[in-house]
Amino acid sequence: MQHIAQPTNHLSLITTLLITNHLSLHHMARKNNSSDKDQELNELIADYEAAKKENKPLYLDGDQLADIADRYALSRRFDEAQEVINYGLELHPGHTDLMVEQAYLYLDTMQLQKAKNVAECITENYETEVKLLKAEILLNEGNLDEAEKLLDSIEDKESLNTILDVSYLYMDMGYPEKALPWLTLGIEEYKEEEDFLAAMADCYRSGDHDEQAIYIYNKLIDKNPYNASYWTGLAKSHFNRQEFEKTIEACDFALAADENFGEAHLMKAHSFFHLENESKAIQEYQLALKGQSIPPEFAHMFIGLAYTHLENWELGYQNYERALKFIGDEESPILTDIYSNEAYCLSKMGRYEEAHQICERAKEKTPESAELYLQEGYIYLEEKEIDKAKESWEVAIRCAPEAETLIRIGNYYLNYNMLENARMCLEEAKRLEPEHPSIDIRLASLCLIQQDYKGFEKYNQLLDPPLNLRDVQEAMALDCVDGAMRKKIDQFIQEIDEFKNEDSDEDEDEDEDENEYPDEKEND
């Protein structure tokens, strides 16, 4: 995650989309139940829960119990899902559907090795659902080639369910380009089927082909205007294009169709966050959490970020603490960010000792994380412990010797008006990654602050388009009632003009010398 306000982490577009696209549980891609089947399953669950409450025996087939467990897992009721699977395997030892469901439950709870162990015990390896499960495990291990071979061995590969299952598997695992060939298998036969069109739209969106995705989502909405998932898919495509107002509008239509459609609340929340309406973002994140469309640790992290942007440090800290409680002792991709933000909030409340304790606790869990050392250094800088800040940042650079790390440190120095230190960091970042998209603008701006006209010209000419100093001049004049800053900028622009004139005179002198030199040669 990047930073917009020092040094609070925020939802960059890329991070937001990655998280949003991968929050869906594996079950969502596997089950494409019709409304009739959904109704049957709802009745089955009601019977099961009534029998359980009254402690009455109820015999159910293995596939029925697997469906109940799947629904519970989809609702993130993991303990209840496990209870159903345990009960089912007592009644039906080794039942394939229940074993598959057990493996997926382990995947959903990030227990890859346990999922692999269960999958190895399944004997019916020829079954499509078993191949899908084992392919997902291979993809989780990074074995794309092996997964492709296994999926290619599926016999009924041109059936609609197989095409959808394989396509969504590739999409969910971050390989939308691998989904497209499978979808092309069904274009002629299924091109009017809503489920097929929805998969095509989702595939285009996952592959950043949002214009095509929007076209298909609109086609689906024409067919079925009260389908909340189509409106939400459209919203995600607009979000990809940073069209946040359109995202919110599409989400409103989704919620008009289904007021409990939590994913629409999630996309609204992300959009309000990027529109800097943090209060509304918090409301929508809470509704998304209520609708179980987002894991609670993610929800509280996002809510914490919103409160941090509002500079409500206490509520930000409290939500990061809640997120950590939900994670517990498990591994999580957001653990470092939560610790980092929690430490930042504590430092803003003047609780520096606690902030450093958080950093130390975090380093025990993720010792190679540059983010923690960057944050720790910033806290030391707030305490005016410059040497300790530098020590932390040296470790951060060793952990991540990249331009982005140096840019972050440069920004921290800038925040405390330590301009020479900032410039050294940014120039080293420029050396490491000359084509980094944000270094030249940062260096040009820093030279502007330092009134270094030669440096400014050097970096400004690398920008496309270059900074327009007259615009800067007018903007500064509007911001400075007493005119002091305007006078400073006017003087700086005059110096730049003089510098350009000097360069121009030097160029003319060089041209004259070049013209005279051949004549002298001829006279010889």
Model-predicted regions and their roles:
Residues A81, A115, A147, A179, ...:
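Single-residue signature of alpha-solenoid repeat helices
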Residues E124-T128, D156-E158, L324-K325, R398, ...:
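TPR/TPR-like (Sel1-like) alpha-helical repeat modules
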Residues D63, D97, E129, N161, ...:
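Start-of-helix register in tetratricopeptide repeats
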Residues L91, C121-N125, I154-K157, E189, ...:
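Structural marker of alpha-solenoid helical repeat scaffolds
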Residues L74, D108, N140, D172, ...:
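Register position in tetratricopeptide repeats
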Residues G88, C121-I122, S153-I154, L185-G186, ...:
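Canonical positions in the second alpha-helix
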